[in-house]
Design a protein with these regions (language model features):
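Glycine/proline-rich, flexible active-site/cofactor-binding loop segments
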Residues: 89, 95-121, 231-250, 254-255
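N-terminal Lys/Arg-rich, disordered targeting/topogenic segments
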Residues: 1-43
Length: 315
């Protein structure tokens, strides 16, 4: 009996030993190339998520820079794209989730949170227009004796805009005060020929270089007109006072220096010069025109201070 068990055990060992080479050959198969592709794609998505998240965060950081640093080369241009960095952050967050990049996701969330906080007031107003104002501007014809008015501003880009189209907009939108920037003598002449004086007969136009200027047109008289209300280094910014329901409102046609290479510092200076108008506390101002800046630019927010408000943000 013991011998039989011993023989059986030896046969079993030999059988297992003989099976080993077959098992080794089975594990030597080459890895399929298709199995590598998802891993490479995963790494690419992770790289893009990280890059987009860093760019979105850099955009948010640029928006938070103090005024003196926002005059650095190209900083104003980057800041002007602030709302778009929100979209870039959302794309980065989606890619980070797909590729499981936690750090990239956290950076993207931080950028989205900052930009969302800054842009939210532009989409939700806590102080809507009074019903009386809505009724006034919705009337078939403007009432120049009340305290409400529709105003409009255009940069006509070196006098290349269509004067007839502007006059038609003034008529159709019942505009009572119009501000134009980069006008020329020829453009103003064509504007008069198109009939602007029929709707806005009072005007004040001025030019600092004799070529391009800024102007104001009004349905009611412009009291105390000036060629340059701001004493700006950028351009003459004409002003005039309009009686609106017994309230004297000072309108100014604004055109600051553009933030382009070689003029970064001049751009900030022209906004700082506007900021000096906060000291005129006895005058109620409406500044209309081409500020070459948005609310995201620190120098623009400094100009507003606690005295002025941005109409786009308030509306």
């Amino acid at each position: 009996m013991a011998k039989a068990r011993s023989t059986t055990t030896g046969a079993s060992v030999r059988a297992r030993a003989a099976a080993k080479p077959r098992s080794a050959r089975a594990t030597a198969r080459p890895v399929s190339k298709s199995a590598v592709k998802p891993h490479k794609r995963h790494r690419l998505l992770g790289f893009l998520a990280t890059m987009f998240a860093l760019l979105a965060f850099a955009g948010a950081a640029a928006r938070a820079l103090p005024a003196d640093l926002q005059e650095l080369p190209f900083a104003p241009i980057v800041v002007s794209a602030t709302p778009w960095f929100t979209l870039l952050g959302l794309i980065a967050l989606l890619l980070a989730i797909v590729s499981r990049r936690i750090l990239a996701a956290l950076i993207a969330i931080a950028a989205i949170a900052c930009n969302g906080y800054w842009q939210y007031p532009f989409f939700y107003s806590t102080d809507p227009l009074p019903q009386a104002a809505q009724n006034a501007v919705a009337a078939a014809s403007p009432n120049t004796s009340d305290a409400y008015a529709r105003v409009m501003t255009f940069n006509v880009y070196k006098g290349q805009a269509d004067p007839q189209a502007i006059v038609e907009l003034v008529r159709d939108q019942r505009v009572e005060v119009l501000a134009l920037q980069e006008t020329t003598e020829d453009f103003v002449k064509k504007l008069n020929e198109a009939g602007i004086e029929h709707y806005l007969p009072y005007a004040q136009v001025s030019s600092s270089d004799g070529v391009f200027g800024n102007g104001l047109w009004s349905a009611t008289p412009l009291a105390d007109p000036t060629d340059d209300d701001v004493n700006s280094s950028a351009s003459f910014m004409p002003g005039g006072t309009v009686d609106m329901g017994g309230q004297q409102i000072r309108f100014v046609s604004v055109h600051t220096t553009a933030p382009v290479p070689g003029y970064w510092r001049q751009w900030k200076r022209s906004l700082d010069e506007l900021g000096l108008m906060r000291e005129h506390t006895d005058t109620r101002y409406i500044f209309m025109g081409d500020f070459n800046a948005t609310y995201d630019h620190t120098p623009f927010r400094d100009f507003l201070g606690d005295r002025f408000v941005d109409a786009a943000r308030e509306s």
